[in-house]
Amino acid sequence: MGNTIDTAMCLDWTSLMALRISSIKEKIRYVFNAVPINKRDGARFSVIQFQTPDDQPVITTMVPPLNIHALEQILAPPLRQQGYIDGNRDIGAALREVMNLPWRDTDENGVFLEKLAVLVTDGVPCGLFDAFNGDDPWEISNEMCNQGITLIVVGVGESITQCDDFYCALAHNTGGFYIPFINADRILSSVIGTIIHDQTTFNQVRTHDLYEEIEKNSLFKYSYMESRVKCMIHECQTMNDIRRFFYNHRLSIQHDAHS
């Protein structure tokens, strides 16, 4: 009978991201179309759009039957038209809204559902380099893992490289993975198709061959950060722990550079 999948897309609509609206829509189409037509009636697709730490995320939930044209109508920067170029992203608030969605374990026909959240961002999360009192994305990733929700992070642009190891660890902590934007459509459509057709899980498709595909045509190299990712997962419980980890890592780099 196969699996089907419920998906939540978390979209960072700062002004630089809004400039990529056409390419973002194109990649989301690939994700949507990866769900076979005969599985779409039982699936749900939600969109969470967020901007600054001062704005509330905008949530749209599409229930069956899914419609790509209706989806495209809601994919537009919904908040301040002038955008928000600089500053950190309130990833915790967006992920909290993910947890608040009406996730299911099976569809109406009793078919097992995989639960997927895709975070698309180009910025540094609040709480990584500075203290922040909002929702803790690292703690939420543990909640996602406990509820069987897999997180995949899509990193956009060059600025993301300063924290792509964090986003990689955040996704890995749930059984997911990190993808550079350039490869997102190809990887996501392939992975979703495999999971639905072969009745497998996201964690099972996270293989060495997958990482070779993820790294193609990009600056992202998982092998360069693998040890840091594993350390964050094994040693950190909160964003405060993550922030200390990053601080110590930067100190060690500076020490090595001067030794």
Feature locations, PLM:
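C-terminal "exit" segments of structured domains
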Residues: 178-259
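VWA/integrin I-like adhesion module and closely mimicked acidic/polar interface patches used
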Residues: 123-173
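Loop/turn elements at helix/coil->beta-strand transitions in domains of secreted/extracellular proteins
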Residues: 40-45, 111-116, 146-152
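Von Willebrand factor
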Residues: 2-114, 116-120, 157-168
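Solvent-exposed loop/turn segments at secondary-structure junctions
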Residues: 13-17, 52-55, 84, 123-127, ...
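Surface-exposed acidic, glycine-flexible loop patches that form ligand/cofactor-binding
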Residues: 1, 34-39, 98-113, 142-143
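Conserved beta-strand scaffold positions in the cores of enzyme catalytic domains, especially
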Residues: 47, 151-153, 175-180
